[in-house]
Swiss-Prot record:
The gene is sucC. Substrate binds at residues 264, 321-323. Succinyl-CoA synthetase functions in the citric acid cycle (TCA), coupling the hydrolysis of succinyl-CoA to the synthesis of either ATP or GTP and thus represents the only step of substrate-level phosphorylation in the TCA. The beta subunit provides nucleotide specificity of the enzyme and binds the substrate succinate, while the binding sites for coenzyme A and phosphate are found in the alpha subunit. ATP binds at residues 46, 53-55, 99, 102, 107. This is Succinate--CoA ligase [ADP-forming] subunit beta.
Amino acid sequence: MNLHEYQAKSLFAEYGLPVSEGFACDTAQEAVEAAGRIGGNLWVVKCQVHAGGRGKAGGVKVTGDKEEIRAFAEHWLGKNLVTYQTDEKGQPVAKILVESCTDIANELYLGAVVDRATRRVVFMASTEGGVEIEKVAEETPELIHKAIIDPLTGPQPYQARDLGFKLGLNPTQMKQFTKIFMGLATMFVDHDFALLEINPLVITTEGNLHCLDGKIGIDGNALFRQPKIKAMHDPSQDDAREAHAAMFELNYVALDGNVGCMVNGAGLAMGTMDIVNLHGGKPANFLDVGGGATKERVAEAFKIILSDSNVKAVLVNIFGGIVRCDMIAEGIIGAVKEVGVKVPVVVRLEGTNAELGREVLAKSGLDIIAANSLTDAAEQVVKAAEGK
């Protein structure tokens, strides 16, 4: 689960980190009033979406004119912002963040992730702030400095000083950086973060450190113990099909291909996508119905797959272990009848009651293509998607 910038900054403020005074606004009038409450003669207005690249897409504006703030808010509120990190539809803008403007002397980067290799929280800092850190990692990896947090001892001030020295900070800035580092590390564990970024962490013209932006990703598996964070979830930023799938405990990820995939088990689902690719097809989704699939969930999975207009054929690949193949077959038949499937459906069943499942499908009278193996299923569904 991701947070908006204004939500991230509210958490930063709770831990004593330096952030700009700002207000998240729902209307153009609120945005104008927010500028008045902040004071000064220069403000920054930002569209609030769960995607980077807002500035290049026109979603960030610096202005000293309150009427320009009104015009910006009226233009974006209720519309979708398309950036390099979104699909062609973009993400809806429901709030505008109005902040005081900060005079910048230099831009740094500070972030943290859970590193699967070390099984530790790893902090990363760089002098290359304000740009995509992935680009820095690829082109100049020596400019990224790391600190690994030991879960037994927690974050240590010496780690902050080591990073600060590599960033070229002076003694005053070093103290500020240590406070920021310790606060972020504590926050990361307290709230079960999976990702944290301040890009840029700026040095102001007065020589102070300031958190100019904030990006936070939460470990979805830990939300049960984070009610405050869970309440910050903005469902409008989620893919509609993914959100619908989550209601039925289906693991669904939308992709850009034309072969719909319904599989039980994440590993088998990834293998199915690979073999579809191997035979020249492009998966339209990842969908794992899980080991405890019911007829209702299978039917719902079918509806979700077919709600994607790009899907030209569907591959159902089921290995019956916990779940019975005959039950899956009944779910497929029910969904095909209920939804009125107009695209070819290729089914491969193996495992518990596989023969019975194939028999149920054969007697259904529906136009369902039975596959003898996974390779056969992939070949058949790719041909079907191409209209052959």
